[in-house]
């Protein structure tokens, strides 16, 4: 039985090394699940830190964590994000994000995934508006809202969506972003202001 974070991390590292040699994701999942079944969620989280960019490790590990700690908002977000990155689909991601929001309404990552998981662009804009209102300093949420409003304006010739996009980009520009962001925002605004819907 694995007893420590170091032991669990070593077992995960060995599993990943074998995966890198064989490219057998099924064996990797099985080995990660075996480790996950022998340690506490806290130990497993710590052991997974070096592999946080590998959904192949995170998914089976965090499925176990979430099954043992279903109210752990951050674990739900980590699992939802790994699912999102591997194309698992908006329904499962949205469900996990909603559970994370219920567990911790202040978890911005949960709100972001909840908004991303909406497949209807008009509804996605509405979700990003909710996130931006809840977290007014969240520039990423506001940029996502503006990007989605731009898509909506383009696809449906919606002048209200265009106005929302322009106002939001203008507010981001007014916050004195770094030069590269400023240039991108200015270019975007120039383009959008020239649209005829």
PLM segments and residue spans:
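Structural register within alpha-helical repeat arrays
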Residues: 45-47, 79, 111-114, 145, ...
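TPR alpha-solenoid repeat register
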Residues: 25-27, 75, 110, 141, ...
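Conserved structural position within tetratricopeptide repeats
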Residues: 66-67, 98-102, 130-137, 167, ...
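N-terminal alpha-helical interaction modules that lie
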Residues: 1-84, 95, 195
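Structural signature of tandem alpha-helical TPR/SEL1-like repeats
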Residues: 22-26, 50-61, 85-98, 118-130, ...
